[in-house]
A protein has these predicted regions:
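P-loop NTP-binding core
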Residues: 1-105
């Protein structure tokens, strides 16, 4: 399973848009994906709630639960996990960066 963290301290930089598009492209290519929404604004969750399709999976969580949800995603067959981080939360961004294979800034 590959893990990507999208990090920027600026709001409105396109982190959520990039996360959603990467996850959709992964799904269309046949690789199940999940988005972990670490932003309290929960824009990825809002997008998910407006959709009928169940994939890609989107989970809103706090950084303290990252390990648990990574294992759940792994057991569920996810090939790609994307962290959509908040612009103001250094702690959550750092936690995501520490477990990521790729960090997009």
């Amino acid at each position: 399973m590959n893990i990507v963290a999208i990090i920027s301290q600026k709001g409105g930089a396109g982190k959520t848009t990039l996360a959603l598009n990467l996850a959709i492209a992964s799904e269309l290519a046949g690789f199940p994906s999940a988005i972990f929404d670490l932003d309290p604004q929960a824009s990825s969750m809002g997008w998910k709630d407006s959709r009928v399709d169940e994939s890609p999976a989107v989970v809103s969580l706090h950084s303290a639960r990252i390990s648990h949800y990574l294992e759940t995603a792994r057991q569920g067959g996810a090939k790609l996990v994307i962290f959509d981080t908040a612009p103001h939360s250094q702690k959550d961004a750092l936690e995501a960066a520490q477990v990521a294979d790729i960090i997009l800034i």
